[in-house]
A protein has these predicted regions:
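Active-site microenvironment of metallo-dependent hydrolases
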Residues: 1-119
């Protein structure tokens, strides 16, 4: 089982190709809805004062590649992964951490472990 790329699959296949919901509804289900369910304040939305966690993509090409096995776990163990398609950047707390070519070299990653939820 591999859920790598689930959000990309939702955006590319279920929203763009199958049109089961609007792009706005799909993004809300991937961002705002989980933040609300788990009681994580100021996440999953774009508004003044909220954390600037952003994902830049092309709705015409967003998706994921076919799953493939890589052997990069300790002891040479395998895992399944997919590559993003149509993704141009990821920002965490307002700091860009990924571009269309992959993870960026930065001195300090801006994310934090969420240890407390309000749910």
């Amino acid at each position: 089982f591999c859920d790598a790329g689930f959000g990309l699959h939702l955006l590319g296949y279920w929203i763009r190709e199958r049109q089961i919901m609007s792009l706005e509804e799909g993004i809300h289900r991937l961002t705002g809805q989980p933040a609300q369910i788990y009681g994580i304040p100021d996440r999953g939305c774009i508004r003044p004062g909220a954390y600037a966690d952003l994902f830049l993509f092309d709705p015409k090409t967003v998706g994921r590649s076919q799953a493939r096995r890589v052997y990069d776990l300790p002891g040479g163990e395998r895992r399944l992964t997919t590559d993003p398609q149509g993704v141009y950047g990821v920002w965490i707390n307002g700091t860009q951490v990924s571009s269309e070519t992959g993870a960026m070299e930065i001195d300090r990653y801006p994310g934090q472990v969420l240890r407390k939820f309000d749910s």
